[in-house]
Amino acid sequence: MTRTILSSSSSLSPQQAGSPVIVALDYADARQALAFADRVAPSQCRLKIGKEMFTQAGPALVRDLQQRGFEVFLDLKFHDIPNTVAKAVSAAAELGVWMVNVHASGGERMMAAAREALVPFGADAPVLIAVTVLTSMNDEDLRGIGIAGSASDHAVRLAILAQACGLDGVVCSAWEAARLKTDCGAGFALVTPGIRPTGSDAGDQRRVMTPLQAQQVGVDYMVIGRPITQAADPAATLAAILQELQPGGADV
């Protein structure tokens, strides 16, 4: 299967290919994750598998979701020496995931190695993005680990570095999106956690926006977890979010 690759040189917005919503499968076990997948449609969202779920269920869960027609974002945030990260990214590509990420703080050589590892996969390579500043972190948190300046400024620096290394986009807070679109261009994908539909609890995310607000500032892919996975009717919740994101949808 050929997956969409977002190039920093592309003039097309990544939102033009598929749903902009990525649902975080933050469940206790694979059975619950698959039960959720059976309640929604692949056309409504992509699905994100993080460290907890992948450690517990492994590649089998990815394949089970793919068999149901879903594109999978493997959110393992690889951060290691360049050779190790290159091999990990290559393994993710072999698994057929739609998107995979690395930590931008791993540096230029690490990100470049990850990019090079995907060249043999051609059009079947996953979208490769970098994590800038975790949305759970604020300026004070960064000062605690020796990074001066604001979380926003640091995220922008890391995003520019990731683009220079040939990555397709970054994970960032919605608060940096408008600035990043200006600095990196419309074709550089912005993937944003900390998105909460109106009326939802902010949870453990400190910097949050609603889906419509995020879209308006340039976010391409919105990661949403509990407001969808814990909804009484996840498909209806997704449908409402997607409707809101349509032109004039907020007025319906």
Swiss-Prot record:
It catalyses: orotidine 5'-phosphate + H(+) = UMP + CO2. It comes from the Bacteria. GO terms for cellular component: cytosol. Keywords: Decarboxylase, Lyase, Pyrimidine biosynthesis. It is an enzyme of class 4 (lyase). The keyword Lyase applies. GO terms for molecular function: orotidine-5'-phosphate decarboxylase activity. Homodimer. Belongs to the OMP decarboxylase family. Type 1 subfamily. HAMAP family: OMPdecase_type1_B. This is Orotidine 5'-phosphate decarboxylase. It comes from Sodalis glossinidius (strain morsitans). The gene is pyrF.
